[in-house]
């Protein structure tokens, strides 16, 4: 998708906030513990390369992404530290990963056997992390016999270097620790079955690190916290108070491109879902659902100048309209999503409005919106 550099709509990312969040977490780590910065999905919409470079400078041990292409993007940007692909990569691409020093997740024994076929006639060695399904129900080993067989397969197998073993918590963002503890027990049990020694054992994500005393592990996979966002949907719960300060880094801004007065009975937008009951001032903003600002945001209040104004009518593919209490000049700044947690249109409020999580709101903002980076 072509970035709209000739349109007044941008996602602003404060690299100063990114830096502070990473530094705060690194100060919170246990002695000897390291951090993998999670920059998948284009850094949760913030920009993977730019965020990775900040984390690299501060001292992150490496990076996590979701797919092989994201890892290759970091390598092309001269990121040289460890990069782990958390998702399942087709075994046929194992040589590409190995040639680029990219670590892959092993979901099961069958994957290992297939990957070996592509590696055995080369001089390449693939770095792997053994994935454990401790209760997420997604990918990884969950049966003892299969994990034991995989360990046996890897013994004295020069095609693979066992760099890590990991799992992912399903409910570390909950104050009820019952399932969290169940997952800890399952992971520790699977760890006891190891006959090969990984370089790194890791299970803590952002939520586990800032809310709980998780498993003693070599690494913390720090994801949503990098971007200054609380992983909990209930951050005001006293049981889920973050152990570190989090500084939101993203704002989404545009401006008024058209202002007019409509009259009683006039409709706004497709289907005329808003009909004026009196003379009403309407402003148009050049952003729509094609940018990832979905139609469910109809009615959400954005900040036009210093005034919160509701979105009226259905959000269009490329534009939306707001009802304003007074006429404002063309070019007036419109903050659609604020990086100030005290503002009514912060990203958590936006997520709540459309009944989702702020992860999704940030990730929805696509490449048609240019990213502008600054440091406060």
UniProtKB/Swiss-Prot annotation:
Q: In which residues is substrate bound?
A: 138, 317
Its keywords, alphabetically, are: Isomerase, Pyridoxal phosphate
Q: Which Gene3D superfamilies match?
A: Alanine racemase, Lyase, Ornithine Decarboxylase, Chain A, domain 1
Pathway involvement of the protein, from the record: Amino-acid biosynthesis; D-alanine biosynthesis; D-alanine from L-alanine: step 1/1
The UniProt entry annotates the active site at: 40, 270
Provide the E.C. number(s) assigned to this enzyme: 5.1.1.1
Query: Any idea which residues bear N6-(pyridoxal phosphate)lysine here?
Result: 40
Tell me its cofactors: pyridoxal 5'-phosphate
Q: What Gene Ontology cellular-component terms does the record carry? A: cytosol
The record's listing under InterPro entries reads: Ala_racemase, Ala_racemase/Decarboxylase_C, Ala_racemase_C, Ala_racemase_N, Ala_racemase_pyridoxalP-BS, PLP-binding_barrel
Query: In its keyword annotation, does this UniProt entry include Transmembrane?
Result: no
Any single GO BP term? peptidoglycan biosynthetic process
Residues in coiled coil: none
Q: Which CDD domains match?
A: PLPDE_III_AR
Select a single GO molecular function from the record's annotations and give it: pyridoxal phosphate binding
- UniProt-listed SMART domains: Ala_racemase_C
Recorded catalytic activity of this chain's protein: L-alanine = D-alanine
Family recorded in the similarity comment: Belongs to the alanine racemase family.
Task performed by this protein: Catalyzes the interconversion of L-alanine and D-alanine. May also act on other amino acids.
**What NCBIfam families does its record include?**
alr (TIGR00492)
Name of the protein this chain belongs to: Alanine racemase
Query: Which gene carries the instructions for this protein?
Result: alr
């Amino acid at each position: 998708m072509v970035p709209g550099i000739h349109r007044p709509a941008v996602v602003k990312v404060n690299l100063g906030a990114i830096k502070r969040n990473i530094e705060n977490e690194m100060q919170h780590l246990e002695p000897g513990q390291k951090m993998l910065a999670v920059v998948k999905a284009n850094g949760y919409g913030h920009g993977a390369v730019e965020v990775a470079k900040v984390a690299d400078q501060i001292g992150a041990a490496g990076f996590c992404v979701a797919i092989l292409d994201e890892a290759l993007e970091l390598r092309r940007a001269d990121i040289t530290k460890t990069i782990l692909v958390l998702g399942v990569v087709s075994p046929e691409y194992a040589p590409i990963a190995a040639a680029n020093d990219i670590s892959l997740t092993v979901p099961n024994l069958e994957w290992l056997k297939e990957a070996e076929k592509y590696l055995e006639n080369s001089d390449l060695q693939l770095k792997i992390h053994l994935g454990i399904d401790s209760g997420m129900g997604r990918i990884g080993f969950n049966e003892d016999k299969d994990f034991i067989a995989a360990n046996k397969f890897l013994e004295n197998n020069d095609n693979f270097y066992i760099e890590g073993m990991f799992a992912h918590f399903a409910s570390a963002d909950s104050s009820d620790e019952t399932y969290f503890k169940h997952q800890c027990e399952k992971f520790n049990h699977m760890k006891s079955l190891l006959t090969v020694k990984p370089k790194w054992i890791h299970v803590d994500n952002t939520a586990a690190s800032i809310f709980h005393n998780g498993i003693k592990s070599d690494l913390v996979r720090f994801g949503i916290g990098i971007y200054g966002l609380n992983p909990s949907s209930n951050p005001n719960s006293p049981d889920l108070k973050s152990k570190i300060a989090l500084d939101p880094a993203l704002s989404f801004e545009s401006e008024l491109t058209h202002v007019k007065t409509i009259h009683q009975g006039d409709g706004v937008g497709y289907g005329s879902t808003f009909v004026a009951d009196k003379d009403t001032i309407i402003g148009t903003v050049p952003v729509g659902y094609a940018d990832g600002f979905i139609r469910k945001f109809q009615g959400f209040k954005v900040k036009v100048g210093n005034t919160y104004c509701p979105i009226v009518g259905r959000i269009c593919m490329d534009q939306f309209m707001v009802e304003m209490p007074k006429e404002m000049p063309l070019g007036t700044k419109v903050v659609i999503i604020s990086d100030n947690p005290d503002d009514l249109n912060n990203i958590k409020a936006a997520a709540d409005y459309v009944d989702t999580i702020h992860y999704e709101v940030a990730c929805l903002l696509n490449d048609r919106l240019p990213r502008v980076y600054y440091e406060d």
